[in-house]
Amino acid sequence: MSDEASATTSYEKFLTPEEPFPFLGAPRGVGTCPSEEPGCLDISDFGCQLSSCHRTDPLHRFHTNRWNLTSCGTSVASSECSEELFSSVSVGDQDDCYSLLDDQDFTSFDLFPEGSVCSDVSSSISTYWDWSDSEFEWQLPGSDIASGSDVLSDVIPSIPSSPCLVSKKKNKHRNLDELAWSAMTNDEQVEYIEYLSRKVSTEMGLREQLDIIKIIDPSAQISPTDSEFIIELNCLTDEKLKQVRNYIKEHSLRQRPTREAWKRSNFSCASTSGVSGASASASSSSASMVSSASSSGSSVGNSASNSSANMSRAHSDSNLSASAAERIRDSKKRSKQRKLQQKAFRKRQLKEQRQARKERLSGLFLNEEVLSLKVTEEDHEADVDVLM
């Protein structure tokens, strides 16, 4: 009993560099069978062993060191495996290591009982590290991932196996016409606003655009000189977006029969013109020489009358245009003369004001007196003979 107690206490001490890989059971002699001793654990059943683990902050160890996983699989016999049999999860150096066997019962086969170092480390790793959002690349030298053996799940069950091997799927482009405004992201809202702006400006008239602006922002002030309207993202809500979509749908339904009628009218005009041309050519080919001559004569007469009518109309149009041009020239001439008269009057008025200002400032005409003289000419009754 004393030997077993001393062996137990010796394995509960701190790890030393000379003993980097302690076994989980009591010391055995060479050649002893593991199943013969009670309370011993056969390591070949698992093919892995946690060599050392720090009690320091795992997140700090993640950033300062790289995790290395090595494995040789669980199918290798215990006699063929050497030191490569054991999977090691090394977190930095071997300094300041604590024994994995603290508070561990040797009669239990639970690798990581509650409260042990390994359970603390595994829970700390799963707490400090978010595997779903990490860009951490797992390096597994010597392990066959395709064979189905998951060393990581054997060592620490709380960590998901190979989290970064499954590639993240990109989000598919959603149909924005079926989404509510609150269900869209900021980028989707901007994209949908640009789509609505292009659709409304290209397919609708000015009245419809004003109606949509009033739906989006009832208090918007639009002047006749505005050429664009900026839509703020915070002005739109789910209800307003629903009203805009319904308005656009109703407008497209109203415009559809008009477009179809216009297309049908164009097609019917083209078809009737083609039929009339074909019938005219057929009748002209089956007509006799006399009828063709008479038709040609009548066509010549009609063309002559049409040309004379066109000439008279052109002459009357030219007369009208000449009289209109003459009236325009007269009005321009009168307006020019009026402007010249106004300019001369303004110039004379400014000159008189300037002269009066100069006289007042000089003081030379303060005692000025204006005298009015009237000269009367006497009529000479007698004629003067200039020859004398």
UniProtKB/Swiss-Prot annotation:
Task: Please note every region of biased composition (Low complexity).
Answer: 288-312
Superkingdom to which the source organism belongs:
Eukaryota
Checking InterPro entries in the record gives: FAM199X_fam
> Coiled-coil stretches, from where to where?
none
Composition skew (Basic residues), residue ranges = 330-349
Q: Which residues carry this modification: Phosphoserine?
A: S316, S321
Q: State whether keyword Phosphoprotein applies.
A: yes
Q: According to the UniProt record, where is the region Disordered?
A: 288-358
Which keywords are on file for this protein?
Answer: Phosphoprotein
What is the name attached to this protein's record?
A: Protein FAM199X
Record lineage: Eukaryota, Metazoa, Chordata, Craniata, Vertebrata
